[in-house]
Regions:
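Single conserved hydrophobic/aromatic residue that forms the stacking wall/gate
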Residues: 1-13
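Alpha-helical elements of Rossmann-like donor-binding domains used by nucleotide-donor carbohydrate transfer enzymes
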Residues: 38-42, 113, 117, 169
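Conserved GNAT acetyl-CoA-binding A-motif
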Residues: 122-135
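Acetyl-CoA-dependent GNAT
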Residues: 26-93, 97, 102, 121, ...
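Conserved active-site alpha-helix within GNAT-family acetyltransferase domains
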Residues: 112, 137-156, 163-165
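Short hydrophobic/aromatic beta-strand or adjacent loop that forms the aromatic wall/cage
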Residues: 69, 165-169
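Conserved acetyl-CoA-binding loop-helix of GNAT-fold acetyltransferases
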Residues: 101, 107-120, 145-149
Length: 174
């Protein structure tokens, strides 16, 4: 797996009362890690439980190992904080998949870190457009709010997706 470190320094005030250094590491395609497997399995079970049959597009681990998909787990120190994947639909068009925040880190803006990381990686890979499919139910409202906060706009179904009352589709031009 490839490792990438991001560093961010936050200074409380101009007198330097204290300095907080946050180190987040990103590991690509580490499906052998038990913590990653546990998080993904929980993600699959939960999404399949809230989506009607035929409307769930969540990928299992073998699905995420497809050569068209790049998967990252994000860590702070030795704790898994979340994950996300990027699927190549066309040479300049990618789709976000399997975005998940570990339960312990919910409501701490980790979803924003994951989406930011995926957008940054998408730009590095030369994508010009990103898309995502998510659920239309109340359970998915936080995800929809997160994506629109990054400028994603509703769009028609893309790639293999079809109109579905249980799905919402979004895209972002980079």
């Amino acid at each position: 797996p490839r490792l990438r470190r991001q560093r961010q320094m936050c200074i409380r005030d101009r007198y330097l009362d204290y300095m907080f250094i946050e180190i987040m590491k990103s590991i690509e395609n580490n499906f052998d890690d038990p913590k990653v497997n546990e998080l993904l399995n929980k993600h699959f079970i939960e999404l399949r439980s809230v989506s009607p049959e035929g409307s769930s597009h969540v990928l299992d681990i073998p699905g995420l190992k497809d050569p068209s998909i790049r998967f990252w787990s994000l860590w702070e120190e030795e704790e898994l904080i979340g994950c996300g994947a990027l699927k190549t639909l066309e040479p300049n068009h990618g789709e976000f998949k399997s975005i998940r925040v570990a339960d312990k880190f919910r409501k701490q803006k980790i979803g924003q870190k994951i989406v930011s990381h995926l957008i940054d990686r998408s730009k590095q890979l030369g994508f010009k457009k990103l898309s995502i499919e998510t659920g239309s139910g109340e359970f998915f409202a936080p995800a929809r709010k997160l994506f629109t906060s990054f400028g994603f706009e509703t769009c028609r179904p893309f790639a293999h997706y079809k109109e579905d009352i249980n799905s919402c589709y979004y895209s972002l031009n980079l």
